[in-house]
Amino acid sequence: MEILRFLLSLFIYFLLLNLSLSHFPSISAQRTNHENFLKCLSHRINEDDSRIIHTSKDPSYFSILNSSIQNPRFFVLETPKPVSIITPVQATDVQSTIKCARLHGIHIRTRSGGHDYEGLSYMAKSRPFVVIDLRNLRSITLDVDNRTGWVQSGATIGELYYEIGKLSKSLAFPAGLYPTVGIGGQFGGGGYGTLMRKYGLSADNVIDAHIVDANGSFLDRQGMGEDFFWAIRGGGGSSFSVVLSWKIRLLDVPSVVTVFKVVKTSEKEAVSIINKWQYIADKVPNDLFIRAMLQKETEVYASFPGLYLGPVSDLLALMKDKFPELGLEIGNCREMSWIESVLWFIKGESMEILAKRKRTSRSFKGKDDFIEEPIPKTAIQYLWRRFEAPEARLAKIILTPFGGKMSEIADNEIPFPHREGNLYEIQYLAYWSEEEDKNKTNTEKYLRWVESVYEFMTPYVSKSPRRAYVNFRDIDLGMYLGLNMKTKYEEAKVWGVKYFKNNFDRLVRVKTNVDPMDFFCDEQSIPIMKYVNDI
């Protein structure tokens, strides 16, 4: 019996080995494919191709690659590097890249701002690849009279805020807090920030898009169709196409808003106030956004930063009625314009900082959960005490309130499904210095801290499935391995339903229709089915 088991195992091993070897070309064939791809692309590009094509032999290669690695955890020698980087300057360059890549069997990744939590926009773990870096496609055109704008995917949300702020003090757009995040990734996964309770996600306010599909065709909303347009707004746009630009809806904000921050250093008081926050943060008027945060400097503390779309007098009256436990006073508050509030949240001094690009210096690992019922005070107390660990010296736990507009939008309106019924989303983040990445043991202790907090929270978070936000990508949820004879759909459903709930199957249908050869793929991309009717 043991001999039979051994022979069976040996047979399976060689079968899998044969399959893997037949699936990927030899090293020499890969090199030839890449050379032919570059010849094809050079022939198609009308301009000076040195501005667009960068191989490892070029002086520009490493400066371009490294400039947008926004998690230094992957800024190490072991991280797989692209065989070349393409920096298109116009839509036809992207079309040519896709056509040549398909013709010569080249795998691609698309990078906007480089903020993918797991680095999947600029690395691939299983095969040679080319990065399409959209840094040169960053134009922003705003129409204040019609309250719309076009913004290219290579722009950052900071650049978008900057352009809005230059033109108007009474218009805004709902996106994230960190100005260096790329538009392509932010909108493609959903995108939220301080205006989410008032206006929803970034993707909720996208009304058209320009893309290049897997055939190299240039399409707008009408050309791609409503299912395709639905999928790229929150379903991870890079699974379906290269999104070149987005048409957005600009939204009204009052000329005066109020920002505030309250800090609590007493464990007992902080735990009590966070507990109360759970019961009111999603139910207060839509004009009010209050986050709760745990972190550590010299000591552990809780902070409650927020934005109110109105004057301080109205805010103080509202807080006295709805959340007196916080003890908000006029000294905690500042009136300003909305664009100034964007700067306040990042501790910036001038608008120009929004338009500057820089690479972060801290490595990190993040996980997140959605909370449907208030967690017990004992759990909050546990989270506070986890910051006593040495590896939590730079860590953060961020609680972001939902409710408001987020609860008014149907969970299938776009692929982002986390709507009504969610009190808040909670993120667990560990940070460490880039220098510490040189020692794997150092890195592992930070990863374990995040994992331990995540495991502790299991009884208190969403279930069946335990859900997650695709823009906070977590490779621990699963990735394509090609083992156990499972189809890609079977593998992907493990994490796909966590990110997209019941919208996952519709995303698979769209993917199968628009990219049947699975050209746009990564370790957690939307899969295809062999037959659409299999779903």
From Swiss-Prot:
Q: What is its EC number?
A: 1.1.1.-
One Pfam entry name: FAD_binding_4
**UniProt signal peptide:** 1-22
Cellular component annotations (GO), alphabetically ordered: extracellular region; plant-type cell wall
Q: Which residues are glycosylated?
A: N18, N66, N146, N215, N439
**Cofactor list:** FAD
Q: Which PROSITE patterns match?
A: FAD_PCMH, OX2_COVAL_FAD
* Localization in the cell: Secreted, Cell wall
Tissue expression pattern: Accumulates in cell walls of etiolated hypocotyls.
Q: Which family does the similarity line name?
A: Belongs to the oxygen-dependent FAD-linked oxidoreductase family.
By what name is this protein known? Berberine bridge enzyme-like 27
Q: What is the native source organism of this protein?
A: Arabidopsis thaliana (Mouse-ear cress)
Lineage summary: Eukaryota, Viridiplantae, Streptophyta, Embryophyta, Tracheophyta
